[in-house]
Amino acid sequence: MLTRSTLVTNSALALLGLAMVVLCRQGVNEIHHFVIGFGWVAMLQALLYLVAVWVVLNRPVDRWTFVIIVVCAIACRLVCLFSPPFLSSDIFRYVWDGQVQAAGINPFRYIPADAHLAFLRDLEIYPHINRRDYAHTIYPPGSQMLFLLITRIGATVRWMKAGMVGLEALTIWIMVKLLQALGLRREQVLIYAWHPLVLWEVASSGHVDGAALPFIALALLFYVRHKPVATGVALAAATLIKLYPIALFPALYRRSAWRDWRMPAVVAGIVAAGYASYSSVGPHVLGFLPEYAKEEGLDSGSRYFLLTFARHGLHWDALPTSAFYVFSALLLLGLAVWAFLNSEAGDMTAIRCGFVIATVLMLLFSSHYPWYYLWLLPFLSLIPYVPMLYFTTACFYLYTTQLANPGPAMYYMFEWLYGTTALVALSCMARKAFALHPRNS
């Protein structure tokens, strides 16, 4: 029933949604015609998004609220979909890998510049492939299967983006089902559907991380519905597309079912079968991953902000990289045990455990690429934790600034990002403590 309160809510969201669409269009236009710069577009969109989140969490809603949310989400995606990718060139490798497979060649066998693949070179895809002169593909088997499937429909960037956006958009529908199953308002899907990270890193850049999101959401939904085999299938699919979702396993394996090996067997079997499909290249089925670890400083420790901060900010110059690895491993192991022991404490508790594991993993990893944080967004729709809402939104904006350049600038970016997130977390804790123990007047 439409009331004055819900009319205010819907009017506010309609205006905010329209502004989000306009800013998507302006961001696309900034590629060719500088007006205010993409960084300003990103900042404005991030601020409007946070206002929209506040509205949907604190204002009354009706059936039209959900319609407005979905329509605006679709409109934003369509604006970004039909524009060329400009924040990343990864999608050109996706199309290339699909074409290589269509030619009957294992995509892990040759680098794009290899003479064996000269017959596949063209002017639309090949010149734009990053690391084409020295890097094998890094994308896991699940991603490779998607690349092959989509390029059989159309071997173009637009078709690849359409495939990724189509899969990502399924996440909205799945999240609505999950919200309803948990007794939460379906309008909270706005937290996911309107997030600028999704709009620009999936709808605009077409990152394959977006294709993992519906399977992560499905794993959560099947867990809530007490379907362990289906949970395992969805988790395995997400893992084969992007490796990190496997970290959710301890939270999604019910302690009461520890004698039931179906779920872990399904996960292990599907992941093994996926890699076996490309095993004709032997250990090279890992692709560029080992070299990538060196290139990104994963082996030396230069990649990890918390380690760098300990060495330079806290002046623990002699702290070895191995100590950070041990600390990270023990912390994640402890969280895994905690999640497993709490798997029978309720569906929301298990989801919260998974969210904590995913968050801690990403904070330890301190990715140099914003799309790696995409998998946190489905959790935020279920658990709107303010510090991580701030973190993911600020992350989106800061990566559009000059602070995102590798080197000292990026260190200062992380120092600002982690520091302000810590302040937001402390303020939330203080507010909660004050609410529980108000001062006597």
Predicted regions mapped to residue ranges:
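Specific aromatic-rich, kink-prone transmembrane helix
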Residues: L170-I174, W200, A211-K227, A358
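Intramembrane catalytic core of multi-pass membrane enzymes that act on lipidic substrates
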Residues: V61-G163
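Transmembrane-helix motifs of polytopic, lipid-linked glycan transferases
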Residues: L48-N58, L149, T156-L182, R186, ...
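Aromatic/glycine/proline-enriched transmembrane-helix motif characteristic
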Residues: I172, V271-Y275, A293-S367
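Hydrophobic alpha-helical membrane-interfacial segments at the cytosolic entry of transmembrane helices
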Residues: I69-C76, A257-S280
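Transmembrane-helix signature of polytopic, membrane-embedded enzymes
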Residues: R63-I68, M175-L197
